[in-house]
């Protein structure tokens, strides 16, 4: 099979050095050249395959080129939009909350294994009919990773990251919170976080959230010194209100 016939146009999407090909109901992700940390990428994909996380595309198999790891095959999530694409779509609050809870389930699962995502932005989360999916996890960080491996991705993230620090559960949560708040309220808070600061994100939120208690809760989530997951602090309460 000639995969070039199925190559996707992903020039605007972060793919961590890989190229995507869609054939039938699966995606092939192949690395254009062997990255410096190819062993870590292989380890990460094998780990994700074995962990059987909720709300991520199922990893079907590993691809080798000779003896070297060259990519993997995963489930294709059809009819999906990235959170960036879905941000301005007419989607009910109930369905948005449902999708946000899904991506937080995945984040909490990873954190329970001492794994951080690090590479968090609106293009790495998919929405489809009330469901949320986390994608592009081949650069997850394990607690025992060597400093050079972590530093490599810190250098990459300095360019377009909301928080220029080595990934921790707190930075993961804050980044994902900004992604989800952008998606929920239909306001691009991510770009403000990247180009300005978390303080400016909070100021922007005050422009369209009149409830001071809600602002207070979000400020707790965006605290760099404490871990307060967004879905626990804000969206569990919102879900109760919407169900009344």
State the predicted function of each range.
Residues 107-127:
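Catalytic-loop of the protein kinase fold
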Residues 95-109:
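Conserved alphaE helix
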Residues 223-244:
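Terminal C-lobe "cap" of eukaryotic-type protein kinase domains
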Residues 55-99:
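Conserved structural core of kinase catalytic domains
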Residues 139-220:
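C-lobe/activation-segment region of protein kinase-like
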Residues 22, 76, 126-127:
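Conserved hydrophobic "DFG−1" position in protein kinase catalytic cores
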């Amino acid at each position: 099979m000639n995969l070039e016939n199925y190559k996707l146009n992903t020039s605007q999407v972060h793919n961590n050095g890989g190229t995507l090909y869609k054939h039938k109901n699966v995606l092939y992700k192949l690395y254009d050249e062997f990255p410096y940390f190819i062993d870590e990428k292989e380890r990460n994909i094998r780990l994700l395959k074995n962990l059987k996380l909720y709300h991520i595309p199922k990893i079907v198999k590993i691809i080798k080129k000779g003896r070297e790891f060259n990519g993997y095959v995963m489930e294709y999530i059809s009819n999906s939009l990235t959170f960036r694409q879905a941000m301005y779509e007419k989607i009910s609050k109930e369905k948005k909350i449902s999708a946000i809870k899904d991506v937080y389930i995945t984040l909490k699962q990873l954190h329970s294994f001492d794994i951080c995502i690090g590479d968090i932005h609106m293009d790495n989360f998919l929405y489809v009919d009330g469901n949320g999916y986390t994608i592009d996890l081949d650069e997850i960080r394990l607690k025992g990773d060597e400093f050079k491996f972590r530093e490599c991705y810190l250098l990459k993230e300095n360019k377009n990251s909301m928080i220029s620090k080595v990934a921790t559960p707190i930075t993961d949560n804050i980044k994902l919170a900004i992604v989800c708040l952008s998606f929920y309220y239909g306001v691009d808070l991510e770009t403000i976080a990247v180009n300005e600061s978390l303080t400016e994100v909070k100021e922007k939120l005050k422009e369209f959230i009149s409830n001071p208690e809600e602002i207070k809760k979000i400020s707790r989530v965006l605290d760099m010194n404490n871990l307060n997951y967004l879905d626990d602090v804000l969206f569990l309460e919102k879900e109760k209100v919407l169900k009344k």
